[in-house]
Amino acid sequence: MKKKLAFLGAGSHADAIAPVIDPLLYDFVGFFDDKDITEHDGYPVLGKLYDVLPYLEDGSIDAVFITIGDNAKRKELFEYVAKDYYDFIINIISPNALVLTPDSICGRGIFIGFGAFIGSKVKLFDNNVVNTGALIEHHTVVESHCNIAPNATINGLCYIREEVYVGSASVIIQTLDISSCTTIGAGAVVVKDIIEPGTYVGVPAKKIK
């Protein structure tokens, strides 16, 4: 029997993820969003973001996915739902993504987009976004609530801590440790550990704020 799926967030991030839903597993029923709208892309907005729990409790919905790009907001919503309904949070993985070792998926709320590559022995934890064409190489650990943008490259044996944003076409060389709450700008090349949260840009990447 197919599960009834709703998205938390009705915006461009939801539009990017929706085509990857497996129609054999899920019936999409609508959105929850704080904007003053009643529908999005032909589906109803069922309530505000924090109105979702009664729907899970009464069985109106039995699968959810958080479609908000901002790491901090996505983390807040994930923890709100996961407290009582962790098992209702699904993973959405494109059939065109390549995940070399199935045990790399170590949590829930994970999105892996078209053409992404997840190397051997990688560990992806809760509520991570791995966008189109991103590459995460062998033995790298990505803690929860991160966002890896399109065509970003994280080389092997890295450790990416919580709430990191890795910008489009940026590169993190092998064996580095990246502090939580770090933003790496598009096209940056990170060549040493980042021990202090902030925004890093350029080649080599340097902190700007």
Located regions from the model:
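Structural signal for interior beta-strand "rungs" in well-ordered beta-sheet cores
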Residues: 92-208
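Short alpha-helical
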Residues: 12-15, 72-73, 105
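Generic structural signal for conserved hydrophobic packing positions in ordered secondary structure
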Residues: 9, 21, 64, 89, ...
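Short amphipathic alpha-helical segments
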Residues: 18-20, 76-80, 124-125, 196
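Hydrophobic, well-ordered beta-alpha structural blocks that scaffold small-molecule cofactor pockets
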Residues: 1-44, 48-56
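Cofactor-binding loop segments of dinucleotide-utilizing enzymes, especially the Rossmann-like FAD-
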Residues: 10, 33-34, 69, 94, ...
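Phosphate-bearing ligand-interacting subdomains
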Residues: 37-98
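Short active-site oxyanion
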Residues: 3-6, 28, 61-65, 180
